[in-house]
């Protein structure tokens, strides 16, 4: 184990050399930087050794537009086994390590896609797998969210303003990226991924876009000050923010440049590594390298690898043969708008060579399908480049060795619906890899109290082998449950204090904590939750609901800046919160709070404190979800639909220990073309009452018409979607029944606590350790280096 005292001594030396101060004089950012640098120094030998070990074996690379790493200082100290010692040593010197909770998360992701990537890297490092990640070093990430008059406001998330001590700039590994209209430098920053209980350390390499020439001195001398830095700004725009708004032509070009920048830089780097160890013959490249595409964002890597191999002297056929043996593709969505398509002319204007290569790949697919006797009608449905568009998901499916979904129901939809044409031709290509989470961050680190409760009963083996947690099923006595409930109450009190400090809202810890935290999207149905809260509110007010257990409804979500309806839903939820929180009749019955700037670190407070986890997307829309797993692991029941990993959670923990409701995917598919939500609206007074709050002045959108637009989208639809596209009214009454049943069951603290603890005890399947082992064994064919 690394010596904590040595790290503290080096930290104090850093403070003296960098700032000429002692620890007691240092600010939180100064302490964080010095401590981080001391840890980076302490792990440097192991990091270097791990890089060398990985070089000489078959290895895998993870390409992702997002990585939600969370606060790294606590996680790294925890994985090194010295968090408690460092905390004690700092406390003895008058410093509280908890002050570092004010340090910004690295703004490198948005939702589950990025957090999954981070969990995978953690699991791979912990289990000594040769996996490295590649991503982008966004200057401002997505955005920092706040609310003004109930509306979401976005501002730049300047997470690097106090430095970035967990990254190391590698100028010697810089590569050049060529677009049709500019050349830029991709400068790598390396971030260590510290494995738990091992000397193995993985690497996340993040690319930053910089100009070939920092500054046009001649233009500046001619007093053309803006022009002197214009090119620098254009280049830096490429990695300025995550997911640039693509509602305009220029926004689309920038987003494509971002994706190509990630792909080309990473592939050039991998080829360089390969040649350094194995020489210039790239014919065995696929035998030594596996690359996983995390969704469609890095799919442009496929034609780019072909281009790079052709530049090394290969012909197209040889280059493409190697390429399709190298890549695998993880699909994360069945939403048509998220299955990326690029206008062909726009694509050609950015990377013309790749447009030609994609056309050739399309020809290969056509000829192979014809040789297999596939009908022309089916071939037409499978075109990669057609109708003036390039379909990136189709490209990824055809040109990858394996394609996987991320929950069993999702993988079934891929096989039998979304990609059924490909599945009919190459069924062995398709796999399921149910998502997972790292129990080290999402239990060991964020819920020390529950982790200690478990360790006292079954030992600590679950930290590296979550299947061990099933032993907890033998510890379900009333006394065990009472002790578990005490832990849960501690976490609720802690979250209550955090929310009071950050949001200015008091939520009594003795209330039920009913939580929905996730990306804001119509299909995730935060609006359904809000309408249900209004139904409860009205039912309490009119006396028809007399046995309601006092509840705090907690929301957290960011809406994409250009997603107008999602932002309107945020406004509606905040208006509902204002209505209820200001009503004296509700003081001891209900609270509603929408936390601002929900992120990984906020989640670490919320997940352990929740009593009820809302996972309410309509069946067949959520690929998997990982928030549902984090809640489950922390002893929270799921109030959810037959969707994504909810199904597998209910299978593992038992439906009797969760609250599953709503139409199945088969039923929704059968009624999709004939479903009329107005029949429900007209026939169910409770539905009409809550729907009318959008238009009758109960809550106000300031006369903007935004709430009326939501109302009309549900009852009448729009040109681009059917009425009630996500079946809010269809599922409303079953949802209310399940929600109120869970609320009522909470009163029996032992019985409800047993449901919660049974979820924790049944969470073994949902470790990213299990998921990453399956990827390693069945997709990448890589082995542990230990």
Place the predicted regions along the sequence by residue.
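A conserved ligand/cofactor-binding region detector
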Residues: 1-786
């Amino acid at each position: 184990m690394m010596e904590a005292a040595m790290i503290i001594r080096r930290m104090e030396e850093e403070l003296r050399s960098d700032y000429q101060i002692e620890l007691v004089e240092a600010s939180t950012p100064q302490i964080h930087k010095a401590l981080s640098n001391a840890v980076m120094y302490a792990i440097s030998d192991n990091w270097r050794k791990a890089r060398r070990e990985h070089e000489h074996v078959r290895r895998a690379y993870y390409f992702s537009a997002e990585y939600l790493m969370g606060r790294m200082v606590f996680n790294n100290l925890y994985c090194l086994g010295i968090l408690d010692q460092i905390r004690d040593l700092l406390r003895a010197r008058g410093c509280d390590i908890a002050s570092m909770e004010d340090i910004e998360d690295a703004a490198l992701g948005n939702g589950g896609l990025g957090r999954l990537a981070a969990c995978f890297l953690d699991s791979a490092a912990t289990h000594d797998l040769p996996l490295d990640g590649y991503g982008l070093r966004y200057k401002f990430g997505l955005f920092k969210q706040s609310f003004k008059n109930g509306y979401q406001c976005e501002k730049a998330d300047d997470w690097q303003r106090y430095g970035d001590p967990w990254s190391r700039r590698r100028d010697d590994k810089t590569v050049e990226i060529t677009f049709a209209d500019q050349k830029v430098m991709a400068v790598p920053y390396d971030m260590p991924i510290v494995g738990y209980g091992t000397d193995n350390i993985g690497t996340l390499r993040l690319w930053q876009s910089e100009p070939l020439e920092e500054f046009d001195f001649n233009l500046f001398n001619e007093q053309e000050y803006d022009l002197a830095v214009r090119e620098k700004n254009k280049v830096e725009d490429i990695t300025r923010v995550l997911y640039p708004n693509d509602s305009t032509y220029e926004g689309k070009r920038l987003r494509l440049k971002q994706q190509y920048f990630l792909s080309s830089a990473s592939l050039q780097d991998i080829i360089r590594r390969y040649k350094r160890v194995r020489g210039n013959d790239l014919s065995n490249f696929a035998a030594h390298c596996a690359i996983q595409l995390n969704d469609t964002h890095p799919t442009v890597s496929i034609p780019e690898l072909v281009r790079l191999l052709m530049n090394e002297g290969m012909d197209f056929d040889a280059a493409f043969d190697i390429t399709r043996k190298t890549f695998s593709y993880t699909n994360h969505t069945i939403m048509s708008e998220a299955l990326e398509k690029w206008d062909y002319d726009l694509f050609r204007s950015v990377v013309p060579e790749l447009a030609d290569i994609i056309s050739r790949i399309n020809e290969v697919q056509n000829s192979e399908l014809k040789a297999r006797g596939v009908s022309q009608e089916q071939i037409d449905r499978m075109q990669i480049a057609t109708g003036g568009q390039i379909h990136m998901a189709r490209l990824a499916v055809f040109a990858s060795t394996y394609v996987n979904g991320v929950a069993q129901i999702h993988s079934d939809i891929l096989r039998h619906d979304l990609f059924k044409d490909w599945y009919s031709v190459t069924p062995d290509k398709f796999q399921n890899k149910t998502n997972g989470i790292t129990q080290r961050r999402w239990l060991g680190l964020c819920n020390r109290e529950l982790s200690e409760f478990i360790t006292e009963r079954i030992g600590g083996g679950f930290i590296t082998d979550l299947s061990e947690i099933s032993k907890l099923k033998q510890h379900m006595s009333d006394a065990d449950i009472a002790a578990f409930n005490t832990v849960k109450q501690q976490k609720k009190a802690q979250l209550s204090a955090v929310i009071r400090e950050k949001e200015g809202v008091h939520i009594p810890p003795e209330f039920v904590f009913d939580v929905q935290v996730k990306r804001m999207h119509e299909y995730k149905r935060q609006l359904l939750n809000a309408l249900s809260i209004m139904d409860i509110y009205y039912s309490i007010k009119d006396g028809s609901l007399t046995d309601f257990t006092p509840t705090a409804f907690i929301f957290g979500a960011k809406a994409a800046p250009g997603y107008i309806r999602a932002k309107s839903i945020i406004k509606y939820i905040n208006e509902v919160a204002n209505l209820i929180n200001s009503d004296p009749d509700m003081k001891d019955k209900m609270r509603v709070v929408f936390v601002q700037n929900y992120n990984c670190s906020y989640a670490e407070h919320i997940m352990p404190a929740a009593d009820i986890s809302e996972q309410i997307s309509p069946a067949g829309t959520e690929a998997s979800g990982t928030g549902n797993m984090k809640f489950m692991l922390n002893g929270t029941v799921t109030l959810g639909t037959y969707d994504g990993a909810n199904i597998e959670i209910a299978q593992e923990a038992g439906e009797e220990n969760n609250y599953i409701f709503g139409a199945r995917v088969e039923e929704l598919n059968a009624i999709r073309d004939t479903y009329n939500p107005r029949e429900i609206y007209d026939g169910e007074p409770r539905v009409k009452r809550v729907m009318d709050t959008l238009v009758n002045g109960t809550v106000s959108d300031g006369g903007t018409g935004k709430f009326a637009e939501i109302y009309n989208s549900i009852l009448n639809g729009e040109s681009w979607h059917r009425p009630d596209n996500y079946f809010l009214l269809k599922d409303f009454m079953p949802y209310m029944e399940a929600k109120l049943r869970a609320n009522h069951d909470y009163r029996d603290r032992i019985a409800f606590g047993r449901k919660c603890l049974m979820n924790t005890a049944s969470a073994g399947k949902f470790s990213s350790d299990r998921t990453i082992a399956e990827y390693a064994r069945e997709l990448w064919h890589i082995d542990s280096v230990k």
